[in-house]
Swiss-Prot record:
Name of the gene this protein is made from: AIM4
Extent of Polar residues compositional bias: 1-12
Record's keyword terms, sorted: Cytoplasm
Disordered: annotated segments: 1-21, 70-101
Lineage: Eukaryota, Fungi, Dikarya, Ascomycota, Saccharomycotina
Name of the protein described by the UniProt record: Altered inheritance of mitochondria protein 4
Organism: Kluyveromyces lactis (strain ATCC 8585 / CBS 2359 / DSM 70799 / NBRC 1267 / NRRL Y-1140 / WM37) (Yeast)
Amino acid sequence: MDKHSLQQQVSQLKRKNIENEDLSDVRKEDIKKPMSAELGIKSIFYDPDWNPSGKAPFGLKNIPYNPRTFRRDTPIEPRLNGLKEIPLPKPNIKDQDQKSS
């Protein structure tokens, strides 16, 4: 066997071992980290009764809330960007007729 080809094979094996070790470390880290879809009690979708894992509904992204800035069940003050009075839309006559029938 040629000395050059033997060295080449050894270096390839070392590279493969290094690549496999790196991948195994990444896999271990993925297992340790919580899934972004399920954040548990830190999820904005968390509810102890209907969503204890805090999993995001289909089509929505789950992000952890900041407990210093996000408070549950607090009244929300609307921001009207300087508008003082916004006229409400007039009720639709057809809708009122259907409700009374």
